[in-house]
Amino acid sequence: FDEEMVVALETHDFEPVKVLQWRNNRLDFSSIDALRDSLEMAPDHRSLTRVPVATDQHALEFVARNEAGRLARGLDGARLLWECCQIPDYQGISPANHGEIVTRIYSDLVKHRHVGEDWIAEQVRFCDNASGDIDTLSNRIRQIRTWTFVANRKNWLADPSHWREKTRDIEDRLSDALHERLTQRFVDRRTS
């Protein structure tokens, strides 16, 4: 930080904020359309502005346009859909790709009461590889975090304790491998 910034921080001397971003927190789960409308609600104060559309809202729009959106009926259906839409996009993938993940999870939950065991196993197995360079390992860590999040959701998996342990173990091994690659890179640069 430069000296001016340090002084401003120490003396709490900042430019006044003229506009704050806002998103409605009183969501209407009576239907998908009602939920979408409540998310689109404009603030009622002139010093507030709506936040940019977030990942969860993009996912909601994606699911609402496909077959899974028709599965969301009533309060419970819309509320569960919104919970699924709030799966973080740790991978930073396209809204459509993230929407596909949300769609699959929501569809499985509605149709089978749990995310499909074979499907989650396939997703986790794909991440379970500690070889590769720094970028590859970083990507796998982001991917496994999605499945760790899913494993920690109440009642989403038939055997959540198994998947929590499995995803945590994979993430730990990937993190260790990434640390090793970063250390090696640092050592290689220092010795050359």
PLM regions: where:
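Extended, charged helical/alpha-beta scaffold domains that provide interaction surfaces
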Residues: 69-192
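C-terminal or mid-to-C-terminal helical accessory/interaction module adjacent to the motor/catalytic core
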Residues: 1-82
